[in-house]
């Protein structure tokens, strides 16, 4: 069987697995495979290495086996100069990001500046590093007449001279600046606001000289140095012209000696400013006061809610009636607002059928059915306001020890609502009762040993 036919069954395994599935390869005899790899390295002569074609027999181009020939230098920006000669090139270092005060440069010989702004007669520089190519001039500085600036696709600037129809990498404005700076007399560093034919320096600028005599300018406002004279900037020229036009208007006239009236008039601006400051301060104080009120108001409401209503309105009540009513209210509230707890005969402790969720552990009294009819015929009279009862309920623990013996568990009596069983039990009278009604109730309940029919009317 041919070797090609042995590989056909394994062809489906070469297909990529479906999306979301993984293929796991299991090597049954990995030790033999590893041993074969080691033998192939240790004994290359005995190993069955696959035969490979030599490099010469492969389909490779002829240039693969030949060394590249040195080609003639093409005309490029790196291998050319403005004059066209590329034989005497020397390395030139970029000074665009350097400080002009820390450079050691040779002075540039003066030359004649033509009316078009092009230097016509420059002496050969003493160093190959020309100052004109070491810094950048902003684009807003005007070019000499007849010149135009353009940029290459890579973003580098070059200049076109339409007078003689030539192009150059050198900025013609640098030649103008060097001519102006070199013609200045060599002297120690000049201080700020030097008077030159072009006028004084702007405010914050200072001119200084390097050890070689080159002039540079220091900007004290942003702490920077520049080779460019700020007086050549057209923006500075426009500012100077505007200042010169406004100078006569701004000149103050001679003022007479100040008098009290003129002093008051002269300080009108200060008074207006002071008034505005006071108004702003007043507004800030008002906002701060409102903020403090917003912070204090919740605390004040919380304190008021904690004070009982009886204590707040205690001064307006009649002191004579207060003691009697309070005693009756105590008696009534001790019994959970149920006047039938003091009867003794009808009260009995029943078996509790509650689920145990209630906090109360005492049973509710059962009122006999024959007594309910007589209660409906009684005159209830005027009722005391219900708002006073919850206030007295908070004082249960203070009076429970002084009560006479009843069937109520004093240790477990608390101020929470009782869970009652609806229809079988008489609902407690939550409304407060007057002293007359309480006396009538006690009279009726106390006559248990007498004949009930003499006191009650049955329907």
Swiss-Prot record:
A cellular component term from Gene Ontology for this protein is: cell-cell junction
Q: Enumerate the Pfam families for this protein.
A: TEADIR3, WW
Gene Ontology molecular functions = transcription coactivator activity; transcription corepressor activity
Where is the sequence biased in composition, kind Pro residues? 250-260
Q: Which SUPFAM superfamilies match?
A: WW domain
Q: Which GO terms describe its biological process?
A: hippo signaling; positive regulation of transcription by RNA polymerase II
Residues recorded with modification Phosphoserine: 30, 80, 98, 134
As recorded in UniProt, coiled-coil segments are 269-297
Q: Where is this region: Transactivation domain?
A: 261-459
Chief site of localization? cytoplasm
What keywords sit in the KW lines?
Activator, Cell junction, Cell membrane, Coiled coil, Cytoplasm, Membrane, Nucleus, Phosphoprotein, Repeat, Repressor, Tight junction, Transcription, Transcription regulation
Q: Cite the SMART domains for this sequence.
A: WW
Give start-end positions of Polar residues composition bias: 354-363
Which domain of life does the protein's organism represent?
A: Eukaryota
Q: Which residues form the WW domain?
A: 141-174, 199-232
- Region: Disordered; residue ranges are 1-22, 65-99, 126-145, 246-268, 344-363
Compositionally biased tracts (Low complexity): 1-13
Which effects follow disruption of this gene? Incomplete epiboly at gastrulation, characterized by blastopore closure defects and impaired axis formation.
Q: Where in the cell is it found?
A: Cytoplasm; Nucleus; Cell junction, Tight junction; Cell membrane
Q: How does it assemble?
A: Interacts with tead1.
Q: Which family does it belong to?
A: Belongs to the YAP1 family.
Q: What is the protein's name according to its record?
A: Transcriptional coactivator YAP1-A
């Amino acid at each position: 069987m041919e070797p090609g036919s042995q590989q056909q069954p394994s062809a489906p395994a070469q297909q990529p697995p479906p999306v979301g599935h993984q293929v796991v390869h299991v090597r049954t005899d990995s030790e033999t495979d590893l041993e074969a790899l080691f033998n192939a390295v240790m004994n290359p002569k005995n190993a069955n290495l696959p035969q490979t074609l030599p490099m010469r027999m492969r389909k490779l181009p002829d240039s693969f086996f030949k060394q590249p020939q040195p080609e003639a230098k093409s005309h490029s920006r790196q291998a050319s100069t403005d004059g066209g000669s590329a034989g005497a090139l020397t390395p030139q270092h970029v000074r665009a990001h350097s400080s002009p005060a820390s450079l050691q440069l040779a002075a540039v010989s003066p030359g004649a500046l033509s009316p078009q702004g092009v230097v016509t007669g420059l002496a050969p520089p003493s160093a190959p590093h020309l100052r004109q190519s070491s810094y950048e001039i902003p684009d807003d500085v005007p070019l000499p007449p007849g010149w135009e600036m353009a940029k290459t696709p890579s973003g580098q600037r070059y200049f076109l001279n339409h007078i003689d129809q030539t192009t150059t990498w050198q900025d013609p404005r640098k030649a103008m600046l060097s001519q102006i700076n070199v013609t200045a007399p060599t002297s120690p560093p000049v201080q700020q606001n030097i008077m030159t034919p072009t006028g004084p320096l702007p405010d914050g600028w200072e001119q200084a000289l390097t050890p070689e005599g080159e002039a540079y300018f220091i900007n004290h406002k942003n702490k920077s140095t520049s080779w460019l004279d700020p007086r050549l900037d057209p923006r500075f020229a426009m500012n100077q012209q505007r200042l010169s036009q406004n100078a006569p208007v701004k000149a103050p006239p001679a003022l007479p000696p100040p008098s009290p009236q003129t002093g008051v008039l002269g300080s009108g601006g200060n008074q207006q400013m002071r008034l505005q400051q006071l108004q702003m301060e007043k507004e800030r104080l008002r906002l701060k006061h409102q903020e403090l009120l917003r912070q204090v108001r919740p605390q004040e409401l919380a304190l008021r809610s904690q004070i009982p209503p009886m204590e707040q309105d205690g001064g307006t009540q009649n002191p004579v009636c207060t003691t009697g009513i309070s005693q009756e209210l105590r008696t009534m509230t001790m019994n959970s607002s149920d006047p039938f707890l003091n009867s003794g005969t009808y009260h009995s402790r029943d078996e509790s059928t509650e689920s145990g969720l209630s906090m109360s552990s005492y049973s509710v009294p059962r009122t006999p059915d024959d007594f309910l009819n007589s209660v409906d015929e009684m005159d209830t009279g005027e009722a005391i306001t219900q708002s006073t009862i919850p206030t007295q309920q908070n004082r249960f623990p203070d009076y429970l020890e002084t009560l006479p013996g009843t069937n109520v568990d004093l240790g477990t009596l608390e101020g929470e609502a009782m869970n009652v069983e609806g229809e079988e039990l008489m609902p407690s009278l939550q409304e407060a009762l007057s002293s007359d009604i309480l006396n009538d109730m006690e009279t009726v309940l106390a006559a248990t040993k007498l004949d009930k029919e003499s006191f009650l009317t049955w329907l």
